[in-house]
Amino acid sequence: MTAILERRESTSLWGRFCNWITSTENRLYIGWFGVLMIPTLLTATSVFIIAFIAAPPVDIDGIREPVSGSLLYGNNIISGAIIPTSAAIGLHFYPIWEAASVDEWLYNGGPYELIVLHFLLGVACYMGREWELSFRLGMRPWIAVAYSAPVAAATAVFLIYPIGQGSFSDGMPLGISGTFNFMIVFQAEHNILMHPFHMLGVAGVFGGSLFSAMHGSLVTSSLIRETTENESANEGYRFGQEEETYNIVAAHGYFGRLIFQYASFNNSRSLHFFLAAWPVVGIWFTALGISTMAFNLNGFNFNQSVVDSQGRVINTWADIINRANLGMEVMHERNAHNFPLDLASVEAPSING
């Protein structure tokens, strides 16, 4: 009998670190993208919590009229927000060391830029980490591709839109009421409800919710019975078991009779591809729509498109929406503008008869 002894090669500290970072045996996979993701998301989260609680008012419009957003300055969970960086800063990179003091940095909304840039870097790295773990496990890359939809949406409202409008002050505030304010002002200035890419996004989100509910209810309703009629069907299964617990043929037959034969899937892979692709493609289109409207390529304008034989306007829903848009635009940033852009750009009517 011959014993073969091999000398174990001593791994350097860097080598052990690399093995630990890329190990799929860890309880939570870190990965090289995680090395950047963890500090950026921790920074964004920490600054968000501190600023949401205690940040002083921010001069968002750059006109020396600070807006309060934190809890300690009179807000609640609904009205509170991280106020976007001041219009006086524009698109300038504004870290703490660029300000004369921390007070000035806070007054100009420095925390918003810090949170947004770290957050976007962090979620992009999370997407890369999904791909990295899939790669190391020999999986296909579509999980990261699906996650690219919310990443694209966040990038559109927090980065692309401010770039197109020329200032981080036009970015979406980080709060509940601030989000609604952003949506209302966006509609007023860009008529997003009349943009086909937004319509595709609505179809994607609502359709995805509908298909998810339909799929989940069908699967949980078409169990393969492993028990008798006298005991619960749940007794026939173990959590996490390898064997399938439902019959796709039965679900296909049920749904085919409920609507019509070709409205249901009899192939599990094509079904789940559809469930993933529908909302993802819809959200991609919405992000693309926000990114085009950032540069003022706005929704369709059908205002005053129907007139009678005398040339009088017959209002359509497009005119009703336009009237609402003008009202919203008049009311936002009241002290920063004398007139909304749509009204100020029209020639004054003749008054000499």
UniProtKB/Swiss-Prot annotation:
Keywords: Acetylation, Calcium, Chlorophyll, Chloroplast, Chromophore, Electron transport, Herbicide resistance, Iron, Magnesium, Manganese, Membrane, Metal-binding, Oxidoreductase, Phosphoprotein, Photosynthesis, Photosystem II, Plastid, Thylakoid, Transmembrane, Transmembrane helix, Transport
Listed EC numbers: 1.10.3.9
Positions bearing the site annotation: Cleavage: A344, S345
Broad class of where this protein is predominantly found: plastid
Membrane topology recorded in Swiss-Prot or TrEMBL: Multi-pass membrane protein
Biological process (GO), any one: response to herbicide
Cellular component per GO, a single term: photosystem II
A Gene Ontology molecular function term of the record: oxygen evolving activity
Assembly and oligomerization: PSII is composed of 1 copy each of membrane proteins PsbA, PsbB, PsbC, PsbD, PsbE, PsbF, PsbH, PsbI, PsbJ, PsbK, PsbL, PsbM, PsbT, PsbX, PsbY, PsbZ, Psb30/Ycf12, at least 3 peripheral proteins of the oxygen-evolving complex and a large number of cofactors. It forms dimeric complexes.
Protein family according to the UniProt entry: Belongs to the reaction center PufL/M/PsbA/D family.
Name used for this protein in its record: Photosystem II protein D1
Native species: Phalaenopsis aphrodite subsp. formosana (Moth orchid)
